[in-house]
Amino acid sequence: MEKKYILALDQGTTSSRAMIIDEEGEVIGVAQEEFDQIFPKPGWVEHSANEIWASILAVIAGVLLKTNISSKEIAGIGITNQRETTVIWDKESGNPIYNAIVWQSRQTEDICKQLRKDGYEDTIRSKTGLLIDPYFAGTKARWILDHVDGAQERAEKGELLFGTIDTWLVWKLTGGRAHITDYSNASRTLLYNIYDLEWDDELLKMLNIPRAMLPEVRPSSEVYADTVPYHFFGEEVPVAGIAGDQQAALFGQGCFEKGMAKNTYGTGCFLLMNTGEKAVRSENGLLTTLAWGLDGKVEYALEGSIFVAGSAIQWLRDGLRMVRQSSDSENYASRIESSDGVYVVPAFVGLGAPYWDSDVRGAVFGLTRGTEKEQFIRATLESLAYQTRDVLYAMEQDSGISLKTLRVDGGASANNFLMQFQSDILGVPVERPENKETTVLGAAFLAGLAVGVWKDKNEIKKHWKLDKRFEVEMKDDQREDLYEGWHKAVKAAQAFK
């Protein structure tokens, strides 16, 4: 039986999904399963690693049954995952010693404060490209070792293993034969030197993490190990591709050349720009990260995150009840020619890159007696585009690369008004692909390259199909006037603390 399909596993923050992708890069089947969010204290977020594993087994079985495809036809498996979420488990039994601590969780704030106090900020920045923040995996591992009796001792003896979600899933799928991660996930731990491409002794000492518990770091596309037959109806299937979700989306968008960038409009926004084989150190509050390792070399990216994007549209719907469903926002915004000087700064949880101001809160400016809900809705949508320009401007400043086009995906990329305004306020075209499942496609493409479903990146590029290209329609002076108004609004919001 010909092996012509790739199984892509997308292990996300609220659900796990499995998709089967054919040689043309088309998704031919999907299965999805949600799992519980655990909130032990305010600001803490955890998952049961065993429940995540059970959800992965369920979606694999579900998608194979739904599509009537035999596991004998699967050429390889690609994995993409919520980044930074951390698991520590017993090497012998395979049981986690504590819940997985999720990327959103703030429970390691005290550890981060101590690192700052001890003056580690520059060291971490210069070796990892990251900031000291509870977001990243290293402090989560330290927290678990501190809070589970005997864990530090057992880790030093080599009895415990550490991993991000990709590592945990590969370990389980292969029956413990492979304890690995890829470059993209390793670069989110605070423990990995992204320049020397190795676990860094100084960083390990800083957080007192025993080297014995760390996974081997491998390229993002190669055959790592085969699954154990009992997970796949009697088949051994190669696990052949891994990338963290945002890097996978960059790959799935075909952003293979230096200077290509994508924006994922989800609850927040994640912008990544490929900077090629050279790491760019940011002077503007962006993260430097590994994009992927492929063909014997690594490529780097600049990353900026916007905290509030799609959630601002949900706020219009659920908080203010201005729209019945999120998609109505496009209709309201398109009814008027402009937002008439109204600016919404959606800093509900502070502002991310490039401001990094956690104390600022949301604000609205420019209201008059004539302001109606159309202006308010339009201004809210426009705020997503302004924030995107802020980040992309910082990327251009850091990299010295001028953006030619922006590729987009995620829920809010379906909003035609927003995409047109995004193009106008950036002054570059915006391209939306037909297949918006770019994260899953990225994982599938990485696996498919390793097992020979696709020959090279040039062949993959052909499977990226354009849905719509939004060309710039706004005049330069109008663009700069609007953008200047946005900056005034942000400054005013920051003054009100």
From Swiss-Prot:
Q: Does the keyword Metal-binding apply?
A: no
Q: In which pathway does it act?
A: Polyol metabolism; glycerol degradation via glycerol kinase pathway; sn-glycerol 3-phosphate from glycerol: step 1/1
Q: How is it modified after translation?
A: The phosphoenolpyruvate-dependent sugar phosphotransferase system (PTS), including enzyme I, and histidine-containing protein (HPr) are required for the phosphorylation, which leads to the activation of the enzyme.
Write out the residues that bind glycerol: 83-84, 135, 245-246
State its Enzyme Commission number(s).
2.7.1.30
- Residue numbers binding ADP: 13, 17, 267, 310, 411, 415
Which residues bind sn-glycerol 3-phosphate per the record?
13, 83-84, 135, 245
User: What EC class does the entry list?
Assistant: transferase
- Reaction equations catalysed: glycerol + ATP = sn-glycerol 3-phosphate + ADP + H(+)
Q: What Gene Ontology molecular-function terms does this entry list?
A: ATP binding; glycerol kinase activity
Q: Does the keyword Iron apply?
A: no
Q: How is its activity regulated?
A: Activated by phosphorylation and inhibited by fructose 1,6-bisphosphate (FBP).
HAMAP family, per this entry? Glycerol_kin
State what this protein does.
Answer: Key enzyme in the regulation of glycerol uptake and metabolism. Catalyzes the phosphorylation of glycerol to yield sn-glycerol 3-phosphate.
Q: What is this protein called?
A: Glycerol kinase
Lineage of the species this protein comes from:
Bacteria, Bacillati, Bacillota, Bacilli, Bacillales
